[in-house]
Amino acid sequence: MDNIEQRVKKIVAEQLGVAEAEIKNEASFVNDLGADSLDTVELVMALEDEFGMEIPDEEAEKITTVQQAIDYARANVKA
């Protein structure tokens, strides 16, 4: 597990109140981890803060799983 993946999972755990060990990469924020629409907005904001990036709304709507969040962060994080 790389640093970005660990950081994303830590944020997901903190935002959704789920144990990090229970977070699978393919898990859906809504269907598997119990997030509602407010949770997903807060999750996107936390990812933006953690990685120092801006996630446009149309992109944020496409991030529905842990792996998609990891992939987005990897592609857009400023090294």
UniProtKB/Swiss-Prot annotation:
What happens to this protein after translation, modification-wise? 4'-phosphopantetheine is transferred from CoA to a specific serine of apo-ACP by AcpS. This modification is essential for activity because fatty acids are bound in thioester linkage to the sulfhydryl of the prosthetic group.
Q: Which GO terms describe its cellular component?
A: cytosol; membrane
- BP terms from Gene Ontology: lipid A biosynthetic process
Q: Does the keyword Transferase apply?
A: no
Protein keywords: Cytoplasm, Fatty acid biosynthesis, Fatty acid metabolism, Lipid biosynthesis, Lipid metabolism, Phosphopantetheine, Phosphoprotein
Q: What is its main location?
A: cytoplasm
HAMAP family membership: Acyl_carrier
In which family does this protein belong, per the annotation?
Belongs to the acyl carrier protein (ACP) family.
Please identify the protein, giving its name as recorded.
Answer: Acyl carrier protein
Q: Which gene encodes it?
A: acpP
